[in-house]
Amino acid sequence: MAEDFGFFSSSESGAPEAAEEDPAAAFLAQQESEIAGIENDSGFGAPAASQVASAQPGLASGGGSEDMGTTVNGDVFQEANGPADGYAAIAQADRLTQEPESIRKWREEQKKRLQELDAASKVTEQEWREKAKKDLEEWNQRQSEQVEKNKINNRIADKAFYQQPDADTIGYVASEEAFVKESKEETPGTEWEKVAQLCDFNPKSSKQCKDVSRLRSVLMSLKQTPLSR
């Protein structure tokens, strides 16, 4: 029993057994030591703390970390996504969106052609307006002349009609002047007499004419005995 207790006491009081060594960690440590030796041999060792502080004042003061690049072996390199790459991307987008030369020339030619067509259409429109105005003036002049000729011909025909031998027989006035003069008279009770002067009361023997004997008798009775108001 004493031996057993001695075994436990010795195991508890003694140093712990060494842990098993990790092969990967050992390999990495070996590689790091070799790289450090190569850098020391080539003169590219790690910079001193004062050099790092002087090279990166923004980091020492706690600001301006965004403006500084990446430090590798004491040299500062610009980040890949910095302002220079931004300008290059903008220039590339401009080149992509720029019109081809052929399309630009075609667009300019079309614009020039449309301007020429607009100018020609305006000139043609002005010519048509002037021609229409001239034609309208000529038509108005011809119309006025035709109206005057018709008036003269109508007066001649009226005079010839009123001067015919049977003008009094058919109940018409002898002349146009007398008819106008009588029509302007405002004698009460003579209205139906003026109407009767415009009517032909002679009976027609032609079978093609309509029978207006009843209307003639009504007009004759109104002429003799006008309506009393």
From Swiss-Prot:
Residues 1-80 are annotated as: Disordered. One of its GO terms (cellular component) is clathrin vesicle coat. Its main location: membrane. The modification Phosphoserine is found at S11, S13, S217. Pfam families: Clathrin_lg_ch (PF01086). Keywords: Acetylation, Calcium, Coated pit, Cytoplasmic vesicle, Disulfide bond, Membrane, Phosphoprotein. Disulfide bonds join C199-C209. GO terms for biological process: clathrin-dependent endocytosis; intracellular protein transport; neurotransmitter secretion; neurotransmitter transport; synaptic vesicle coating; synaptic vesicle endocytosis. Residues 1-17, 45-58 have a biased composition (Low complexity). Residues 93-155 are annotated as: Involved in binding clathrin heavy chain. It is a peripheral membrane protein. InterPro entries: Clathrin_L-chain (IPR000996). The modification Phosphothreonine is found at T187. It is found in: Cytoplasmic vesicle membrane; Membrane, Coated pit. The modification N6-acetyllysine is found at K204. GO terms for molecular function: clathrin heavy chain binding; neurotransmitter transmembrane transporter activity; peptide binding; structural molecule activity. Clathrin coats are formed from molecules containing 3 heavy chains and 3 light chains. Interacts (via N-terminus) with HIP1. Interacts with HIP1R. Belongs to the clathrin light chain family. Clathrin is the major protein of the polyhedral coat of coated pits and vesicles. This is Clathrin light chain B. It comes from Rattus norvegicus (Rat). The lineage of its organism: Eukaryota, Metazoa, Chordata, Craniata, Vertebrata.
